[in-house]
Amino acid sequence: MHQTNFGFKKVDYTEKQRLVNNVFSNVADKYDLMNDLMSFGLHRLWKDEFIRYIPNLNSHILDVASGSGDIALKLAKKARDRGNNVSLTLSDINEEMLRNAKKKAIDLNLFQNLKFTLASAAALPFSDNSFDYYTIAFGIRNVPDINKALKEAYRVLKPMGKFICLEFSKVKEGILKDFYKFYSFNIIPQIGQMIAGNKEAYEYLIESIDLFPSQDKFRIMIKEAGFEEVNYKNLSNGIVAVHSAYKI
């Protein structure tokens, strides 16, 4: 049986999916607040930079591991403000997170042109060559089989479609790296306990960040899935990186 990491523990693929689903079910109600607290609000700036990689909003966009909908709703608002005709599909494997995304969309009056699909990133229920853009933010490291998810991204994109991924990465050497590691492993789980009542969930999230491949290694994985013109841009000295590629 194939094994992968759930944080620092070795589990089989099916077990990881169940455990990850439990993590996000347990923290769903505090998810947005925790993102603000953990990143000191920086995640909003990272996401603003991320959506700049989508210049054409008259498009079919698939947002995978959509979570509470931050990326898709930013794109929907931008399209509405510009008068663009965007079609957005939000996909996530967790029902509670999708429910929160729907509620936010209704509250922001952005529900029009949005579709919501409960699905795994490694087994998307969409036809080949369906989307102009595939976006995934802070989600791919939680997928049990990352290579399979990348191949699925390639499959559902149209020719010349663009893959864009925002993910935690490897901080460059220096004082920031040491502080970041201390903060991540010692402070964030304590915040998770105080705010979300779940220290273990945030221990997993930090461990998953620590184990995620470096920028260059992930770039190779994207290329091996079939993509071309694969690039990345570090943000905040490499705390996160935006990866982009094309299906040609």
Curated annotation (Swiss-Prot):
CDD domains: AdoMet_MTases (cd02440)
Listed SUPFAM superfamilies: S-adenosyl-L-methionine-dependent methyltransferases
Originating species: Rickettsia canadensis (strain McKiel)
PANTHER family, per the entry: 2-METHOXY-6-POLYPRENYL-1,4-BENZOQUINOL METHYLASE, MITOCHONDRIAL, METHYLTRANSFERASE
InterPro entries noted in UniProt: SAM-dependent_MTases_sf (IPR029063), UbiE/COQ5_MeTrFase (IPR004033), UbiE/COQ5_MeTrFase_CS (IPR023576)
Keywords: Menaquinone biosynthesis, Methyltransferase, S-adenosyl-L-methionine, Transferase, Ubiquinone biosynthesis
Name of the protein in question: Ubiquinone/menaquinone biosynthesis C-methyltransferase UbiE
One GO term of the biological process aspect: menaquinone biosynthetic process
Pfam family, one: Ubie_methyltran
Gene3D superfamilies found in the cross-reference section: Vaccinia Virus protein VP39 (3.40.50.150)
UniProt EC number: 2.1.1.163, 2.1.1.201
Family membership: Belongs to the class I-like SAM-binding methyltransferase superfamily. MenG/UbiE family.
Main enzyme class: transferase
Functional note: Methyltransferase required for the conversion of demethylmenaquinol (DMKH2) to menaquinol (MKH2) and the conversion of 2-polyprenyl-6-methoxy-1,4-benzoquinol (DDMQH2) to 2-polyprenyl-3-methyl-6-methoxy-1,4-benzoquinol (DMQH2).
GO molecular function: 2-methoxy-6-polyprenyl-1,4-benzoquinol methyltransferase activity; demethylmenaquinone methyltransferase activity
Associated pathway: Quinol/quinone metabolism; menaquinone biosynthesis; menaquinol from 1,4-dihydroxy-2-naphthoate: step 2/2; Cofactor biosynthesis; ubiquinone biosynthesis
Known catalytic reactions: a 2-demethylmenaquinol + S-adenosyl-L-methionine = a menaquinol + S-adenosyl-L-homocysteine + H(+); a 2-methoxy-6-(all-trans-polyprenyl)benzene-1,4-diol + S-adenosyl-L-methionine = a 5-methoxy-2-methyl-3-(all-trans-polyprenyl)benzene-1,4-diol + S-adenosyl-L-homocysteine + H(+)
